[in-house]
Amino acid sequence: RSSGQLLFDRQSDAKIMTFNDNVEARKGSSTVFSDKLTIFLDPQTKQTKQAIASGNVLASQGTKIAKGSFLTWDVNTQCAILEDSQNAEFVKEDLNINAQKMILYKDTGKIDIPSPGSLKTKTNEKPGRKKAFGKSSTADNNINVKWEGKMNFLDDSREAFFEKGIEVKKDDSLLYCDKLNVTFNENDYNLQSMKAAQKIHIVDKKGSLYSEAVGDQVTWNAKNMVTVLTGKPFAMLREGNKRQILAPKILFYENSNNVLCEGNGTLYERRPDNKDAQDT
């Protein structure tokens, strides 16, 4: 239904209906509000081939909400394309995604985003949860990811893949990389595992002290609560101006706040008398 003018147009490959002003469209559990709705009908079957909502678009289906300037639904591919010149928004339970363009697949729950964007999770904190990287012991279940390349989200396997110019924020820790794969809990969006590669740079704040780590790959999972940083030939950990460690493999045990280095490495430590000490 709409409060404005309804226009009909007949073309060789489709019949077109255009609804204007305060449009509301419902089908099953889905509802779409928009300023304009254009429906393309197959001239033979008289069934909908494609529908384009434009203007201030707000769509909902169960716990899922989508906002943007354009929403295109294609019957053949069973996918919806959500677009906005600024940022389109997709919300599902504890998951929030923003990007200029999103492709949402109905049957698989897959989301493809070919443009820069951000992903945020907002789950309730649970006692005993630790950070997914860095060494702070603050419990935090939320993760914020920004990327400059693209993102693919697979709801069936609860995975998200990110590429290029990635920034991951978790409490007071930042992870920068160019490739990232994260998995979430089956029942919510608590972070279950993470694997990052290419241009790894971790910045962690603990009180007034900043520590940094650099390497080629970092992994973490919720079972053992250990962050594993590797580098070729070395990964590097620097704790302010007090200590620097070079090793092929550095493990951060978050429950005990300990660090283990594997392989041949080097430790540089500044003594209280400001003289440097080196161990290999």
Language-model segments: residues:
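N-terminal amphipathic/hydrophobic interface segments
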Residues: 1-280
